[in-house]
Amino acid sequence: MLLAQALEKRGDDERAFSEYQNLLLLYPQNVDFEEVQARQFDIATRFLSGQRYKLWGRIPLYRSMSKTTAMFQNIVNIGPFSSVAPEAQMNIGQAWVKKARGFQISQNERHKNYRHAVEAFSKVADKYHDRPEIAAEGLFAAAAAYQRQSLDSEYDQGVTEKAIDSYSDFIALYPNEEKVAAAREQIKAMKVEQARGSLKIARYYEKKGKLAGANVYYNEVKDLAPGTDYAEVALQKIAELQPKLDSLRQSGAAPE
């Protein structure tokens, strides 16, 4: 214990974390388990907050959310129900989000990091379901991670549906949580964005003369975002298209 404390005191946090880990693995009966995990949690949190990893334990060099997630994962693995474990599991997700929002060599890599974040947050909601406050926090964070991932216009917009579903689950399971209003606002914002996309598709179909297809998407717009400018445009278009569609049907031609 003295070696780990000395390393931490002089700022060699990475080695200190490893020494604390060795104590828990090799001498679990001879140390205060909760105290050691608390020290590890504080060290990992410093790295999560932006502290740099050091070269030779002395020269601050780089930040690494991958190494930070591994630290928090070690805490959870060895003490899944310790006092710091739920927050450590949350911080695994936060570290993946930070990594996703940093420089990435490809979109696929960024989306993979968001998926890791969702998995970490979802584990909070599942593993600690008997602690509503932390479980609610995990579910809300999972929804937010899905939402961030959906902001990439080139990515599968099915992720938006997953975000909406997760926020909806949060509202249904934790109706008294303070963030319910925020969840509703995020759902509304995402549906408006979906409506904008559907309106573009509807206009494309209409321009190509595929009136039935355009009508389907205009109806989708009005259902997704009632009361918005998008819905008003869609309702006007539906009214304009209906006589044309009726005329095509009466003539025996199947509208596209």
Language-model regions, residue ranges each:
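Acidic, polar-rich low-complexity tracts and alpha-helical solenoid repeat scaffolds
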Residues: M1-E256
